[in-house]
From Swiss-Prot:
Name of the protein: Sulfate adenylyltransferase subunit 2
Stretches the record annotates as Disordered: 272-298
Keyword annotations from UniProtKB, A to Z: ATP-binding, Nucleotide-binding, Nucleotidyltransferase, Transferase
Source species of the chain: Burkholderia lata (strain ATCC 17760 / DSM 23089 / LMG 22485 / NCIMB 9086 / R18194 / 383)
EC number: 2.7.7.4
Higher taxonomy: Bacteria, Pseudomonadati, Pseudomonadota, Betaproteobacteria, Burkholderiales
Name of the gene: cysD
GO biological process: one example: hydrogen sulfide biosynthetic process
Pathway: Sulfur metabolism; hydrogen sulfide biosynthesis; sulfite from sulfate: step 1/3
Length: 298
């Protein structure tokens, strides 16, 4: 009899193989976090001994933690994968940043528009993503195989039934799919799977003394000199880690002593808050994640 994690693994591998068989030009969105690391491990397993029959795509906002970028490049080189990095040229030309323009504009330009540009440029018709239903309410109601319009928009009213684990990957010309193989996993499942298979992850997930400032109720790490300090702010060293990773000025750390996977698992069993409480972009407005997804966001 399969264990809980083995059932989740089998489901995810089935989804990947099914979509690859029914699409012409698939891609895996690689955001460098723990979910992407698990999804990549599953992809390596699904198509072994061959490499995954699709490239990795990272939509780079230029504001990721430095350790994330180093981990991205090391992972692609170690596994010999086709990594494609897209940076929105409009964001570069207009100097978009989360401080001057705000998190909503920053996210739209760098992430949403950047992703749509990359998908159009390469002609990808199916994109694997690492979103999970337990993360956030709009992700909870989105299907595993999610249809997107020619403009990459998501319409919740056009979702298809997925009875008996049957996935409809049909689409009209110009439409595309967003596919979420680990949709049914929980944060605890992810960490247990990482420990079971010794999957490499970004060191930022482990507690360490790091320079942070307390801003609007969040602990923001001072990752480089671009972070403007407000009046009275002085970076202080605190033992923190991150439950979720994104652009460093928009990602809050948590106080933690978890320096190992065992420590993190124990912390997960005791926590009563969502991992996305540290993502400042989720607080832009009521229902902001669903609005972003309707506009083409991950």
């Amino acid at each position: 009899m399969l264990t809980h994690l083995e059932r989740l693994e089998a489901e995810s591998i089935h989804i990947m193989r099914e979509v690859v068989a029914e699409s012409e030009n698939p891609v895996m969105l690689y955001s460098i976090g723990k979910d992407s690391s698990v999804m990549l491990h599953l992809a390596m397993k699904a198509f072994y001994p061959a490499k995954p029959p699709f490239p990795l795509l990272h939509v780079d906002t230029t504001w990721k933690f430095r350790e994330m970028i180093a981990f991205r490049d090391e992972t692609a080189a170690r596994l010999g994968l086709d990594l494609r990095v897209h940076i929105n040229p409009d964001g570069v030309a207009n100097g978009i940043d989360p401080f001057t323009h705000g998190s909503a504009v920053h996210t739209d330009v760098w992430k949403t528009q950047g992703l749509k540009q990359a998908l159009d440029h390469y002609g990808f018709d199916a994109a694997f993503g690492g979103a999970r239903r337990d993360e956030e309410k709009s992700r909870a109601k989105e299907r595993i195989v999610s249809l997107r319009s020619e403009q990459h928009r998501w319409d919740p009213k056009r979702q298809r039934p997925e009875l008996w684990s049957l996935y409809n990957a049909r689409k009209r010309k110009g439409e595309s799919l967003r596919v979420f193989p680990i949709s049914n996993w929980t944060e605890l499942d992810i960490w247990q799977y990482i420990q079971l298979h010794d999957i490499p992850i970004v060191p930022l997930y482990f507690a360490k003394e790091r320079p942070v400032v307390e801003r609007d109720g969040a602990l923001i790490m001072v990752d480089d000199e671009r972070l403007p300090l407000r009046e009275g702010e002085v970076p202080q060293m605190r033992k923190v880690r991150f439950r979720t990773l994104g652009c460093y000025p928009l990602t809050g750390a948590i106080d933690s002593d978890a320096t190992s996977l065992d420590d993190i698992l124990q912390e997960m069993r005791e926590t009563r808050t969502s991992e996305r409480q540290g993502r400042l972009i989720d607080s832009d407005s009521a229902g902001s994640m669903e609005k972003k997804k309707q506009e083409g966001y991950f």
